[in-house]
Regions:
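Active-site metal-binding loops of divalent metal-dependent hydrolases
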Residues: 6-8, 31, 55-56, 88-89, ...
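Active-site HxH/HxHxD metal-binding segment of metal-dependent hydrolases
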Residues: 8-81, 168-172
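Residue-level marker for buried hydrophobic side chains located in beta-strands
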Residues: 27, 102-104, 142
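Divalent metal-coordination and catalytic microenvironments
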Residues: 5, 30, 42, 67, ...
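Accessory terminal helices/loops
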Residues: 130-140, 149-215
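Short, small-residue-biased leader/transition segments that mark boundaries at the very start
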Residues: 1-3
C-alpha cells in the first residue's frame, strides 16, 4: 500500500493496524508540514520508503527516493508519472496513476479551485494548471484539501451564468448535508466549472487568484 501526504501519523497508524495493511510508500506532493507531518513516525514504524521531488530532498523528512519531472515511478503494482507543478511551492509535484486514471494534485489543483501561491509565481501556477487540462477528461482528481464548498461559492460569484456549475454547487451542498465527501472530482467537470482552469491567459488568472485570496 502507498499513501499520499501523511499530514499526521496517528490516524494512519490506526487505519493500517486495524486493517492489517502493509505500508510500502509515502508519496509527498510538497514539503508543507500539513503534508509531511507523519513521515518520520510512519517510516520508523513500518520501514516504508518516502518519495518526493529531488529539489525538496532537504525539506521532506525521511525522503529516500527522489523523483523528477516527467519521470515514470514504478514499484511493484504502482506506476505513476511525475509532474513538476510549481506555484504553491517551488518543489510541488503531482502523481498521475495513468492506468487507473487517477491523479494526486496536492495543493496545486483543488476541486473548483487552485492553491495559494507561496514560493512560485502566477505564471508558474498558470502553467502547472495547463498540465492537468491535457489529461483524459475522465481522470479522477484527488486534491490535498476539501475546500470544495467555499471554492464553489467563489466560482459561482464570478461565473453566475454557468448552468453546469449551478448543478454542481447543488450537488456539493447536498453532499455536505449528508456528510459525504466531494472528492474525488472529475476533470471533465473541473474544465467546465473551475474558473482557474477556464482562465485563458495569465492576466485573467492572476486577477482571479488575487480575488480568491481575499474572498
Amino acid at each position: 500500500m502507498c499513501i499520499r501526504d501523511s499530514s499526521e501519523s496517528e490516524p494512519i497508524i490506526d487505519f493500517i493496524d486495524n486493517n492489517k495493511i502493509d505500508l510500502k510508500y509515502i508519496l509527498n506532493t510538497h514539503h508543507h508540514h500539513d503534508h509531511i507531518g507523519g513521515n518520520l513516525e510512519l517510516k520508523k514504524k513500518y520501514n516504508c520508503d518516502v518519495i518526493g521531488f529531488k529539489d525538496d530532498k532537504n525539506r521532506i523528512p525521511g525522503i529516500n527516493i527522489l523523483v523528477e519531472n516527467n519521470q515514470i515511478w514504478q514499484k511493484g503494482n504502482f506506476e505513476a508519472k511525475i509532474y513538476h507543478t510549481p506555484g504553491h511551492t517551488s518543489g510541488h509535484i503531482a502523481f498521475h496513476f495513468f492506468k487507473e486514471k487517477i491523479i494526486f494534485t496536492g495543493d496545486t489543483l483543488f476541486s473548483l479551485g487552485c492553491g495559494r501561491i507561496f514560493e512560485g509565481t502566477y505564471e508558474q501556477m498558470f502553467n502547472s494548471l495547463k498540465i492537468f487540462k491535457k489529461l483524459p477528461k475522465d481522470t479522477l482528481i484527488y486534491c490535498g484539501h476539501e475546500y470544495t464548498l467555499k471554492n464553489s461559492e467563489f466560482c459561482l460569484f464570478n461565473d453566475p451564468d454557468n448552468l453546469k456549475l449551478k448543478e454542481k454547487v447543488l450537488k456539493i451542498k447536498n453532499n455536505h448535508k449528508l456528510n459525504s465527501p466531494t472528492i474525488p472530482s472529475v476533470l471533465d467537470d473541473e474544465l467546465e466549472c473551475n474558473i482557474f482552469l477556464k482562465a485563458e491567459d495569465i492576466k485573467t488568472f492572476s486577477k482571479l487568484r488575487d480575488l480568491k485570496d481575499n474572498f
